[in-house]
C-alpha cells in the first residue's frame, strides 16, 4: 500500500493535493480497504423502480460481495432483502430477475414471501418442536438502509448512514436532468453487463469531469462527424461543475432561449413542453440563460450518467438525437470492473423517439459502442501499468487547472453566469477528478464500518 511518501496517510495526502500515487488503480490492499471503509458505508446504486413495475417483480443486484433481492411485494412496496437463507446461508434467489410470489431455498426448502417473511419450513414441528425450537415469525435480513430518488434505488450497508437526500445534497439538482423529463420520470432498458480489466475509479473519474480526453481519445468519432460539436474548442468552452456528492461536464450551446436550445440537441416540442413542467425555473436557466447542457456526470462513488446528442441520420446535417445512459462501475477486484449500463428515456416520450434514442445509445455506448472501445483501451492500459513495482514510485499529476501555488488558472463562474449549485468553471481542468478522489480519501481514512458479531 505504501506510495512515494510511505503508508496509507501519505497516499491519501498526495491524493488530496492532486498528485495521485499511480498504484491506487491496482492495489489489492487498497481494494480491501475500499470494501470495508467505502462500500460498507456509502449509498450505492442498485437499480431503478421501472425495472420492477409489477407486484411480484424482482431483480437481484449486488453491493460488491453482498447479493440483494430488490422486489416489489404483493403490497406494491419495493424492498431490498439480503439474498441469504436464514438456515444455512444458501442464496434464496438464483435468477437475475423475474416475477414470483415466493422464494424457496433449494438447499432445504425454506420458503419466503416476496416481502421477505418466512412462510414455509419443512417439518417445522418434527425437526424443531414448532415455535418452541425455532420461531417461524422471521424475515430475510433487510438492507440496513434502502431509499430512492426519482426512481433510482440505493442501498447503504451502514445502519448509521445519513438519509439518501442528505448524502446526495445539491447534486440532486443535476440528477433531475437525467432522471426527470416528465411527471412520470424515466424508464430503463437493460442493464447490459460486461467486464473490463480496469480499476473502477478510472471510469468514475472520466465521467465526472474529463473533457480533456474527448478530442484525442475519440478523434476517430470526431473525424466521421458523429459529434454535432466537432471542435476541441467546444469542450473547452463547456463548464464542469461539482456539487456536494457529484459533478459533471456540460457543452456550451449556441445563442437562443430554452426551447431553441433544447431543439438544438434534438428534443421534440412535445417533450420540451413536459420538461418545462417538471424542471424548476433555476434548472431551466442553466440551459436557457447560461447556455450549458449537461453531458457526462458521476455521483460518488461509482454511479455515472451520459447525456449526448449524436448525428445519427444520413441526409440531414443538422439532425441530432439525444439519449441518456446510466451506468454503474461495479468493482470485482483491484483490477477488474463489471460495467452495468442502462438506457434511460422519458416514460412519456413517443414510441418512435424511444426507439430512435435507443439506437443512438447503442451506437455510442454499451458493450459495443464506439465511445466505449476508445475509453476502455486507455483504462486497461492504466490499470495494467499501475500494478507494477515502478508505479509505486510515480505520482500522477492531476492538478490541471491549478498554478503551483494552488490558485485556479480560470476562476470559478459567478452565480449569474452559472445558475446551478456548487462550483462551476470553464476550460480544461481536473477539479472534479480531484474532488472525487478527495472524497474517496476521506472514506478510506475513517475506521472500518461496524458489523454485528
Residue ranges and their predicted role:
Residues 13, 18-64, 68:
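Non-catalytic accessory segments flanking enzyme active sites
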Residues 77, 144-453:
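C-terminal catalytic domain of Rieske-type non-heme iron oxygenases
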Residues 51-159, 163-173, 177:
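Rieske [2Fe-2S] iron-sulfur-binding domain
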Residues 41-53, 123-130, 300-312:
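Short Pro/Gly-enriched beta-strand edge/turn motifs at strand-loop
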Residues 1-10, 451-453:
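Basic/polar N-terminal segments that are highly enriched at the extreme N-terminus
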Residues 39-43, 90, 212:
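Generic structural signal for secondary-structure transition and capping sites
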Residues 47-54, 134-136, 367, 381-384:
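Short linear motifs in intrinsically disordered
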Amino acid at each position: 500500500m505504501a506510495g512515494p511518501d510511505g503508508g496509507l496517510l501519505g497516499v491519501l495526502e498526495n491524493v488530496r493535493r492532486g498528485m495521485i500515487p499511480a498504484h491506487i488503480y491496482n492495489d489489492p490492499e487498497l481494494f480491501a480497504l475500499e470494501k470495508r471503509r467505502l462500500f460498507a458505508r456509502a449509498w450505492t446504486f442498485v437499480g431503478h423502480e421501472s425495472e420492477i413495475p409489477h407486484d411480484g417483480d424482482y431483480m437481484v443486484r449486488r453491493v460488491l460481495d453482498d447479493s440483494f433481492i430488490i422486489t416489489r411485494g404483493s403490497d406494491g412496496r419495493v424492498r431490498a432483502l439480503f439474498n441469504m437463507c436464514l438456515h444455512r446461508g444458501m442464496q434464496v434467489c438464483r435468477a437475475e430477475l423475474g416475477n414470483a410470489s415466493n422464494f424457496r431455498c433449494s438447499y432445504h426448502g425454506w420458503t419466503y414471501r416476496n416481502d421477505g417473511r418466512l412462510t414455509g419450513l419443512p417439518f417445522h414441528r418434527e425437526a424443531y418442536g414448532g415455535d418452541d425450537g425455532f420461531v417461524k415469525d422471521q424475515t430475510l435480513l433487510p438492507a440496513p438502509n434502502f431509499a430512492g430518488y426519482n426512481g433510482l434505488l440505493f442501498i447503504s450497508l451502514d445502519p448509521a448512514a445519513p438519509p439518501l437526500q442528505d448524502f446526495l445534497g445539491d447534486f440532486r439538482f443535476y440528477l433531475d436532468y437525467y432522471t426527470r423529463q416528465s411527471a412520470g420520470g424515466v424508464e430503463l432498458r437493460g442493464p447490459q453487463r460486461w467486464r473490463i480489466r480496469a480499476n473502477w475509479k478510472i471510469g468514475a473519474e472520466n465521467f465526472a469531469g474529463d473533457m480533456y480526453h474527448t478530442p484525442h481519445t475519440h478523434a476517430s468519432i470526431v473525424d466521421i462527424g458523429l459529434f454535432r460539436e466537432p471542435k476541441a474548442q467546444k469542450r473547452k468552452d463547456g463548464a464542469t461543475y461539482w456539487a456536494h456528492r457529484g459533478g459533471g461536464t456540460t457543452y456550451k450551446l449556441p445563442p437562443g432561449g430554452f426551447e431553441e436550445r433544447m431543439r438544438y440537441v434534438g428534443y421534440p416540442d412535445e417533450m420540451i413542453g413536459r420538461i418545462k413542467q417538471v424542471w424548476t425555473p433555476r434548472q431551466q436557466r442553466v440551459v436557457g440563460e447560461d447556455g450549458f447542457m449537461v453531458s457526462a456526470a458521476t455521483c460518488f462513488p461509482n454511479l455515472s450518467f451520459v447525456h449526448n446528442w449524436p448525428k445519427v441520420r444520413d441526409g440531414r446535417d443538422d439532425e441530432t438525437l439525444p439519449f441518456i445512459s446510466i451506468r454503474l462501475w461495479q468493482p470485482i477486484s483491484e483490477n477488474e470492473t463489471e460495467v452495468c449500463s442502462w438506457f434511460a428515456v422519458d416514460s412519456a416520450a413517443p414510441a418512435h423517439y424511444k426507439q430512435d434514442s435507443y439506437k443512438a445509445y447503442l451506437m455510442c455506448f454499451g458493450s459495443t459502442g464506439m465511445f466505449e472501445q476508445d475509453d476502455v483501451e486507455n483504462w486497461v492500459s492504466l490499470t495494467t501499468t499501475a500494478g507494477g513495482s515502478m508505479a509505486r514510485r510515480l505520482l500522477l499529476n492531476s492538478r490541471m487547472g491549478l498554478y503551483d501555488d494552488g490558485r485556479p488558472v480560470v476562476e470559478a463562474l459567478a452565480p449569474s453566469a452559472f445558475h446551478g449549485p456548487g462550483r462551476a468553471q470553464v476550460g480544461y481542468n481536473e477539479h472534479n477528478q480531484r474532488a472525487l478522489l478527495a472524497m474517496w480519501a476521506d472514506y478510506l481514512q475513517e475506521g472500518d464500518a461496524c458489523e454485528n458479531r
